[in-house]
Amino acid sequence: GSWD
């Protein structure tokens, strides 16, 4: 997943 990705995080900002």
Curated annotation (Swiss-Prot):
TM segment ranges: none
Keywords from the named record: D-amino acid, Hormone, Secreted
GO molecular-function terms, A-Z: hormone activity
Localization per Swiss-Prot or TrEMBL: Secreted
Keyword Magnesium: no
Changes after translation: Ocp-4 has D-Ser instead of L-Ser.
Positions carrying D-serine (Ser): S2
GO CC terms, sorted: extracellular region
Function summary: Cardioactive; has both positive chronotropic and inotropic effects on the heart. Ocp-4 is a 1000 time less active than Ocp-3.
Protein name: Cardioactive peptide Ocp-3/Ocp-4
Species annotation: Callistoctopus minor
Record lineage: Eukaryota, Metazoa, Spiralia, Lophotrochozoa, Mollusca
